[in-house]
Amino acid sequence: MTTHKFEHPLNEKTRIYLRVESLLRQAHLASGFADNHQYQLFFRALFDMVEIFEQIQLKSELAKDLEKQRLSYRHWLNVEGVDQEALNSLLNEIDVVHSQLMGAERFGQALKEDRFLSSIRQRFNLPGGSCCFDLPALHYWLHLPIERKKHDANQWQKSLKPLSDALTLWLKLARETGHFKAQIARAGFFQSDADEANILRLHIPMKYGVYPMISGHKNRFAIKFMAFENGQACSQDVEFELAVCS
C-alpha cells in the first residue's frame, strides 16, 4: 500500500530543528551541482540557515537537549536485560558529538564571514535577484570548474558539521522513542493525549486522498484530515499509523 509520511513538531524548538534538518539536507543534495539551477537551492539553504542562526541560540539549546538524552539513557546502565555494550556505545557517541558541538564556533559564523557569500547574500533574497547583472560575482563563480565549486561547497558545509552531527543524533534518538500504532480518525478527526512529546509521525495511505492539519502541544494534540482535491475537511474514516515521539 502506498503511503505518504508526515512529521509534525509539538513545540517551537523542535519545529526549528526540523527546519534546519531539511535545509541541511537540501544543501547536501544540491551541492553536487548536477544542473545549472541547483546552485539556487544550495545558496538558498545556506542563507536560510544563517538567518535562523542569527535569531536563535541554537547551539546552547541543542547542547542541553543532548545532555538530557544522555542522562535519560544513563538510567539504563547495569539494568538487567539491557544490551550494555550497545548502550555504552551510544553514550560514547553522545559524549563525542556533545563535545564537538561545545567546541564549535557559533553556528553560521564562518558563513557570515566568508567574503564571497556575504557579497551575494543580500541581493540573492531579491525576487529574480540571481541574474548576472545583479550578482556578477556569483555569475563568475558559476563559470569556475566543477571541482572548484564542489570544493567550496564542501568547505561551507564542513563548518556546519558539528551542528549536523548533533542535530542528526538528537532527532534520530527522539524519533526512536515513538512506535507506530494503527489508529482511526473517525469522520476525519483524531485527538489524543501526549506525555511531553516532541514529534508526531504519521503514515497515511494515499488511497484516502487526504493530508493532515495538526494542532496541539507537548501534552495534547488533534489531527484533522483534509481532502486534497477540494481542500475541505474529510468526512470519511481514515485509517493511519501514528508514532508519538518524546
UniProtKB/Swiss-Prot annotation:
GO cellular component: cell division site; cytoplasm
The UniProt record lists the keyword Transport: no
Subcellular location: Cytoplasm
One matching Pfam family: ZapD
Protein's job: Cell division factor that enhances FtsZ-ring assembly. Directly interacts with FtsZ and promotes bundling of FtsZ protofilaments, with a reduction in FtsZ GTPase activity.
Protein's GO biological process: division septum assembly; FtsZ-dependent cytokinesis
Superkingdom assignment: Bacteria
Protein name per its UniProtKB record: Cell division protein ZapD
Keyword set includes Cell division: yes
Organism lineage string: Bacteria, Pseudomonadati, Pseudomonadota, Gammaproteobacteria, Vibrionales
Subunit structure: Interacts with FtsZ.
Family recorded in the similarity comment: Belongs to the ZapD family.
Keyword set, alphabetical order: Cell cycle, Cell division, Cytoplasm, Septation
